Amino acid sequence: LTCVKEKSIFGVTTEDCPDGQNLCFKRWHMIVPGRYKKTRGCAATCPIAENRDVIECCSTDKCNL
């Protein structure tokens, strides 16, 4: 499985997930109202949302773009 690690104006950085990590995730963490920090990567299980974060998980290549 290949997941997106970073997305910027310079392009997309991907990572090949190690064995046992069969999900890609994308997390939005609110810094201040209207401003979010996005985190992407591989995971074995879908992370649990904390502090009003929004998390999406998926299981196909680059699905967390």
Swiss-Prot record:
It comes from the Eukaryota. One of its GO terms (molecular function) is toxin activity. The keyword Disulfide bond applies. Keywords: Disulfide bond, Neurotoxin, Postsynaptic neurotoxin, Secreted, Toxin. GO terms for cellular component: extracellular region. It is found in: Secreted. InterPro entries: Cytotoxin_Cobra (IPR003572), Snake_3FTx (IPR003571), Snake_toxin-like_sf (IPR045860), Snake_toxin_con_site (IPR018354), Toxin_cobra-type (IPR054131). The keyword Disulfide bond applies. Pfam families: Toxin_cobra-type. Its main location: secreted. Expressed by the venom gland. CDD domains: TFP_snake_toxin. Disulfide bonds join C3-C24, C17-C42, C46-C57, C58-C63. Monomer. Belongs to the three-finger toxin family. Short-chain subfamily. Type C muscarinic toxin sub-subfamily. Negative results: has no effect on ligand binding to any of the mAChR subtypes at concentrations up to 1 uM. This is Muscarinic toxin-like protein 2. It comes from Naja kaouthia (Monocled cobra). The lineage of its organism: Eukaryota, Metazoa, Chordata, Craniata, Vertebrata.
